[in-house]
């Protein structure tokens, strides 16, 4: 059935993230019944894309999953913290909202947490985030860019920047590789810093989603300075000065 095929990419996303996902978790994620989940995965199992074990769906060793190993590796690091952060960020977003999300493991979890929302307009340069949210009824997802990086499926070509700079959204959800004590948020690549700056400029509210292990670290390229009205969402209280932004601590999962 057509509706079954519509959910297959969502199943692959979830399995790619976690390796094994229970039928009950998939039912909650897709907002369908357990029986419907079994109908969705049956042809996927027959094609060898996933394996069915007792009460769960698991990745097939050697089968293609979402993204390359570096991205999946980052998704597995500090997973509980990132899930908690994502849940808190999702509380800041309303049905019908407009937002932009950059590429990153934490923003990938934010996209998963936003699957319960409806009517979102989403701009992103991440193919993972785009496919996660594009199949939700009422959502409008704009994928910025044409050429995708191999290790995370993100785009930083001039088309990506052109799309982003033409938009206006309410919320920007951004990530960082480090929060340097003196220089603030930082990333490892110039293109990532430029994209973060472009996304921040088109939003009324900027939300920086970073787990607590990023504080006190440094990276190569500084992001735009934090400003009044910005929110820094993390998983536990840290001794760090994020002023003039406001620190928001998510409760644990």
Model-based region annotation:
Residues 103-105:
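Glycine-rich N-terminal segment of FAD-binding domains in flavoprotein oxidoreductases
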Residues 78, 99, 122, 153, ...:
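Glycine- and other small-residue-rich loops at beta-strand/loop junctions that grip anionic moieties
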Residues 115-120, 190-191:
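A glycine- and small-aliphatic-rich helix-loop capping segment at beta-alpha/alpha-beta transitions
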Residues 119-122, 247:
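Short, compositionally biased
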Residues 2-100, 111-116, 134-138:
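HTH-adjacent hinge/linker in prokaryotic transcriptional regulators
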Residues 2-13, 17-24, 31-33, 46, ...:
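Conserved phosphate- and dinucleotide-binding cores of soluble alpha/beta proteins
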Residues 96, 117-119, 203, 229:
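A general structural motif
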